[in-house]
Swiss-Prot record:
Name the record gives this protein: Isoleucine--tRNA ligase
Function: Catalyzes the attachment of isoleucine to tRNA(Ile). As IleRS can inadvertently accommodate and process structurally similar amino acids such as valine, to avoid such errors it has two additional distinct tRNA(Ile)-dependent editing activities. One activity is designated as 'pretransfer' editing and involves the hydrolysis of activated Val-AMP. The other activity is designated 'posttransfer' editing and involves deacylation of mischarged Val-tRNA(Ile).
Annotated GO biological process: isoleucyl-tRNA aminoacylation
Self-association state and partner proteins as the record states: Monomer.
CDD domains recorded: Anticodon_Ia_Ile_ABEc, IleRS_core
Catalytic activity: tRNA(Ile) + L-isoleucine + ATP = L-isoleucyl-tRNA(Ile) + AMP + diphosphate
Species per Swiss-Prot/TrEMBL record: Methanothermobacter marburgensis (strain ATCC BAA-927 / DSM 2133 / JCM 14651 / NBRC 100331 / OCM 82 / Marburg) (Methanobacterium thermoautotrophicum)
GO molecular function per UniProt: aminoacyl-tRNA deacylase activity; ATP binding; isoleucine-tRNA ligase activity; tRNA binding; zinc ion binding
Matching SUPFAM superfamilies: Anticodon-binding domain of a subclass of class I aminoacyl-tRNA synthetases, Nucleotidylyl transferase, ValRS/IleRS/LeuRS editing domain
Length: 1045
């Protein structure tokens, strides 16, 4: 079907629905994949979003970046792997399901619901959200293998995870140990460091007196009073000076450097000792009456290099059951790991008086008890950064528990060396942020005391405590002596019922009841998505991955877990290139949250502007690695760009459809291409080259901004303006066809370049414009190869056109100064510059300047020849020298030719004034030169020169000016009648004899411009009549459609 005239306005929802239906009905995505099957492989791994709700703006941004880049790679000929992933296990989903089922604790889950039912509900919830989120991503136009995703609850995927744990065990990197770890009392499970969010929190800040003897105390500061029942020691730094300080009849032992800050100027230092001298000093536990077990324990001062002087007293409360550093130093000194707190954060019987209290609720009771015993020096509050559970937002606590760990500390060096093989965008993401995280990494707590997750494949013998790590479903079936799997279902509680026989003692082996940290789930995605080691061929084809991208929080999340798991399982990094992107924030830079009421949903944006506008905006707004502040007004600007693009498309199809333009019908050498035609072809290819480079480097902001500026500035505001009059030529004129061909080529190249970013509108334009003009072209724009031609780029022409556009803008400013309308022609414009490139550009593109500046003649020069130079005396230098001779010298200079005076100074270095035979010699500093333009000349400057515009209104100029004013009024009347572009009209004008005489010579010009078959000044009223005023002339214009051609 030939090119059809496009809809007059841009309707994104209509376009996007039509295009997505077209893709689905014609199976375009699968056919694009088939088309690229023989191309070089490009392997991409999708960071799996949680199936815990609907997508948000950040999730949309993430998938849009991925989709745009992968569409680009596909059009570059690559066979792209774009399998989506789904993270389906863990606390994010468990919490949502708990809310649905109305349960509040693990006890409720086990007693009221049952693990089997709870796990089933979690799976259903994940599946439902996966379907919803898939639909949302598809609405954004994201092309991925939605029918073949990797899902972390898939048995084949879980099996790869089991294999990874077996590899860790084989390498002696799997460890069960008692350690102090971060713990969520609400979820009753261990947390990894990556699962902790930090926020400001108010806590008690208390100074506690630990009794030594008599009225002497060790002064200790803490913000966690609830950990005092577990205190086993006080740590001091061996090299700090510690003071015995008297205040109010009591002696306090604390760091000398902090005495004045804590106790004030009134405190008196009695003596000072080194911290090392305090080692072994015993004290009585301040809560030994409330927590009786402490009466049977010895408490003493120990030494630790972790003690600082930045805050507190330099004497650090040490509870090995509640702090990682406390635990480590406690091991050195053989301190008991006393932890009187259960999994729910409630004090046990060992906590004495505080038994049954939630730890944070006990803070006030502990403070009151200390105060009543005169063991509290001061109680305040402090605001500080504190860790919260990433899902339920409960403040974390530290507990000593037995957990399973991966020995990351033993593979840290290998991880760092593998990191050097990865390209990071931006580079500092890997070189500083991620490297620092790895360098400070601790062993990874991988066990979770929950239900919906990959069961840890570790069976422990009930008799001899030996372990066996199962690496596959087949291995489990083979080793099982009791219980059996239901198909390949290896979730809890089914897998818990499988009993193995101990290979060492023949005893019964039961699975450890924990599930894996969900970061293990996603950390093994690189091979689990390929079902390795079960399916080795896929793995060899696609691993390792060429590209991944996620937000900057994943430096301690997915980027880290993949690298750690990759080194453990395969001795290498699973990815080669990483783009770390930012977060989406509101206009003020705040995190979006329902509580702030500042959440922008992707659907809201799509409803208002469509998916393509959202896609373009998110890539255009800022550098991808920076946080994105979502600004509705900026979105409007992007929407405006799409409307401008559509208007250009409407312009093109309106005239091309009228003339049944087919690019293949004409030999290029037969067409009359102008400089502006060659320029637009060069510009669009320059833009395509820059976009190619930008997308190759994942600089989406540069790519989109190049496209935006081209559409708005080059294509719409400039090229369409340059060729508009040529499209009105009625015959198959070579000049008009050259404009058509150039505009067609520019639009085709543009939509190919834009299509990875805004696939819907580009597909829609392609189907009409390109498929209409070239019926044998591929069925979808996304089947085209990437279009860019370096040979078509003419850098010199582009530079010259840039100069000419500045010249034309300067001409417009000069007209504004003279209040001289642009529709009125001027007699002459002189372009003045000392830069040869400027003059060369003006000469080369003189025709463009003449047409766009509406000038009869264009001249170029290094100076304006008609400028009058006026010489005046400089009072600052001549006043003191001339005194009474000043007035006659002034008159002589005024009478002299300023240009001659200036020439004399330049050639001879001075100018002589004859005062009745007396010669006065004037130096260059003695004379000031001013310039004066001739009447009717106005000038304006531009970078590189000036323009001088002659605004004299000759009869010929006035005749043409009035004719153009008449054309404008008739065009407005055509619009009022909503006439088609090609419609002919008859025009009758009632005016004064003077106006008729002035415009009669321009009759043919007016008729051509307004498509009039006849223009009559013998007035007859036609169908549509309107009164107008042009300058001081009152007119009546009447028009009607004409049947004449």
């Amino acid at each position: 079907m030939p090119i059809q005239e496009a809809e007059k306005s841009y309707k994104p929802h209509v376009i996007e629905e039509k295009v997505q239906s077209f893709w689905e009905e014609r199976d375009i995505y699968e056919r694009v994949k088939e088309l690229r099957e023989e191309g070089p492989r490009y392997s991409f791994l999708d960071g799996p979003p949680y199936c815990s709700g609907r997508i948000h703006l950040g999730t949309a941004w993430n998938k849009i970046m991925k989709d745009s880049y992968l569409r680009f790679k596909s059009m570059r000929g690559f066979n792209v792997r774009r399998q989506p992933g789904w993270d389906t296990h863990g606390l994010p989903i468990e919490h949502k399901v708990e809310g649905i089922l109305g349960v509040r604790s693990k006890k409720d889950i086990e007693d009221k619901i049952g693990i089997e039912e709870f796990v089933r509900k979690c799976r259903e919830f994940a599946m439902e959200n996966k379907a919803v989120m898939t639909s949302q991503f598809q609405r954004l136009g994201v092309w991925m293998d939605w029918d073949d995703p990797y899902v972390t609850f898939d048995p084949a995927y879980m099996e790869s995870c089991w294999w990874t744990l077996k590899r860790a065990h084989e390498k002696d990197l799997l460890l069960r140990d008692l350690r102090v770890i971060t713990w969520c009392p609400r979820c009753e499970t261990a947390l990894a460091l990556a699962e902790i969010d930090y926020h400001e929190k108010e806590d008690p800040s208390i100074y506690v007196k630990f009794p030594v003897s008599g009225d002497t105390y060790i002064l200790v500061w803490t913000t966690t009073p609830w950990t005092l029942p577990a205190n086993m020691a006080v740590a001091v730094h061996p090299d700090f000076d510690y003071a015995h300080t008297r205040l109010d009849g009591e002696t306090y032992i604390m760091a000398e450097a902090l005495v004045e800050k804590v106790l004030g100027e009134e405190a008196e230092i009695i003596k000072t000792v080194r911290g090392s001298e305090l080692e072994g000093l015993t004290y009585r536990h301040p809560l030994d009456e409330e927590v009786p077990c402490h009466r049977d324990m010895e408490h003493r001062v120990i030494l630790g290099d972790h003690v600082t002087l930045t805050e507190g007293t330099g004497c650090v409360h040490t509870a090995p059951g509640h702090g990682p550093e406390d635990f480590e130093i406690g091991k050195e000194y053989g301190l008991p790991v006393f932890c009187p707190v259960d999994e729910a954060g409630v004090f046990t019987e060992d906590a004495g008086k505080y038994r049954g209290l939630f730890v944070k609720d006990a803070d006030s009771d502990i403070i009151d008890d200390l105060r009543s015993k005169n063991l509290l020096l001061r109680a305040e509050t402090i605001s500080h950064r504190y860790g919260f559970c990433w899902r339920c937002k409960t403040p974390i606590i530290y507990l000593a528990t037995e957990q399973w760990f991966l020995k990351i500390t033993e593979i840290k060096d290998k991880m760092l060396s593998e990191l050097d093989r990865v390209q990071w965008i931006p580079s500092w993401a890997g070189e500083s942020r991620f490297r620092n995280w790895i360098e400070n990494a601790r062993d990874w707590t991988i066990s979770r005391q929950r239900y919906w997750g990959i069961p840890i494949p570790i069976w422990v013998c009930e008799d001899c405590d030996s372990i066996h790590v199962v690496g596959s479903i087949g291995e489990l079936r083979e080793l099982a002596v009791e219980g059996q799997l239901e198909g390949d279902f290896i979730h809890r509680p089914h897998v818990d019922r499988i009993i193995l026989e101990c290979g060492r003692c023949g005893g019964r082996m039961k699975r450890t009841p924990d599930v894996l940290d969900v970061w293990i789930d996603s950390g093994v995605a690189g091979w689990a998505a390929l079902h390795y080691p079960r399916e080795k061929e896929l793995f060899s084809e696609w691993f390792p991955y060429d590209f991944i991208t996620e937000g900057h929080d994943q430096t301690r999340g997915w980027f880290y877990s993949q690298l750690g798991c990759g080194v453990i399982a395969l001795d290498e990094t699973p990815y080669r290139r990483v783009l770390m992107h930012g977060f989406t924030l509101d206009e003020e830079g705040r995190k979006m949250s329902k509580s702030l009421g500042n959440v922008v949903e992707p659907e809201d944006v799509i409803e208002k502007y469509g998916a393509d506008v959202l896609r373009f905006y998110l890539l255009w707004a800022n550098k991808p690695w920076e946080d994105l502040k979502f600004v509705w007004d900026e979105l409007k600007n992007v929407n405006k760009m799409f409307n401008i693009l559509w208007n250009v498309y409407v312009f093109a199809t309106t005239y091309m459809s009228l003339d049944r333009f087919q690019p293949g019908d004409h030999e290029l050498e037969d067409l009359h291409f102008r400089d502006e035609d060659r320029w637009i072809i060069s510009r669009v290819n320059s833009v395509a080259l820059k976009v190619t480079e930008a997308l190759d480097n994942l600089h989406f902001h540069r790519a989109t901004r190049e496209i935006h500026d081209f559409i708005v500035e080059d294509l719409s505001r400039w090229y369409i303006r340059l060729i508009r009059s040529r499209t009105w030529i009625e015959r198959d004129d070579p000049d008009k066809l050259a404009a058509y061909h150039s505009l067609y080529t520019a639009l085709k190249t543009l939509i190919v370049t834009l299509s990875p970013i805004a696939p819907h509108v580009c597909e829609d334009i392609y189907q009409n414009l390109v498929r209409g003009a070239e019926p044998d072209s591929p069925e979808s724009i996304h089947m085209l190869d990437w279009m860019v031609s370096e040979d078509a780029v003419d850098g010199k022409l582009e530079a010259e056109m840039d100069i000419v556009r500045e010249i034309i803008e300067a001409c417009a400013r000069a007209r504004d100064t003279a209040r001289y309308k642009l529709r009125w022609p001027v007699r002459e414009i002189v372009v003045v510059s000392e830069d040869d490139k400027v003059l060369e550009a003006a000469e080369s593109l003189k025709g463009v300047i003449a047409e766009q500046a509406n000038a009869k003649s264009i001249r170029t020069s290094t100076e304006f020849p008609d400028m009058r130079i006026i010489a005046k005396p400089n009072p600052a230098t001549l006043g003191p020298k001339l005194r009474q001779d000043m007035p006659p010298v002034m008159r002589k200079l005024e009478e002299a030719d300023g240009a001659e005076v200036k020439a004399a100074l330049e050639s001879e270095g001075s100018f002589r004034v004859d005062l009745d035979g007396r010669i006065i010699v004037l130096e260059p500093d003695d004379i000031i030169f001013e310039t004066e333009l001739p009447e009717n000349i106005v000038n304006a400057q531009f970078e590189g020169g000036s323009v001088f515009v002659d605004t004299e209104l000759t009869p010929e100029i006035m005749s043409e000016a009035m004719a153009r004013e008449l054309v404008r009024r008739i065009q407005d009347m055509r619009k009022d009648l909503d006439l088609d572009v090609e419609a002919r009209i008859e025009v009758s004008v009632k005016c004064s004899p003077e106006f008729r005489e002035l415009t009669e010579p321009q009759r043919e010009f007016v008729e051509n411009e307004v498509r009039a078959s006849h223009l009559s000044f013998d007035y007859t009223e036609l169908e549509y009549t309107k009164e107008w005023k042009i300058s001081d002339e009152n007119l009546i214009i009447s028009i009607k459609p004409s049947d004449k051609v």
